[in-house]
Amino acid sequence: MLNPFGRTVLRVSLLIRLAQVAFFGALMFTFYSAIVPPALAVQLAPWDKAEHFIAFYSLTVLAVAAFPGGHLLVIAALLSGFGALIEFVQGLSIVHRDRDFWDWVADTIAIASALAPMLLVWWRRVVASGQKNIDI
C-alpha cells in the first residue's frame, strides 16, 4: 500500500503477524536452548542468569508486540510459567541439565523489568485521563 508521498506503508496487522512469528520463533529457540546439552546451546552471555534475563526480557517485549490486546499481567504470568516449565524439564533425568530455582527468578525479574516501563506509561495515561476506576 502506498501513502500520499509514494512510500510503502506496512499495515499494522502485518506488523502484528511478524511480531507473532518472531515471538513464537524466540519461544521455540529459548526452549531448545534450555534442553540441549550446554555445549550445544547458543551462549548469549558469560553468566547463566544474564542469559535468562536477556531471553525473557526479549520474549516479554515480543509478546507485548505480538499480542497488543493481551493483558500485561496475563502475559507476565504465562511467560513466568514458561520459565518454570523450562526448569521442570531441565530437572528430568533424560535432559541431563540441572534445575535451578534462581534461573526462574532471573526469568521473572526480566519479565517485570520489561513490563515496568509499559505499566508506567499506562499509569500516566490513566492519571492524565482522570479515570476513577481502572481495569487491572
Cite the ranges covered by each PLM segment.
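Bulky hydrophobic segments
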Residues: 1-104, 108, 112-136
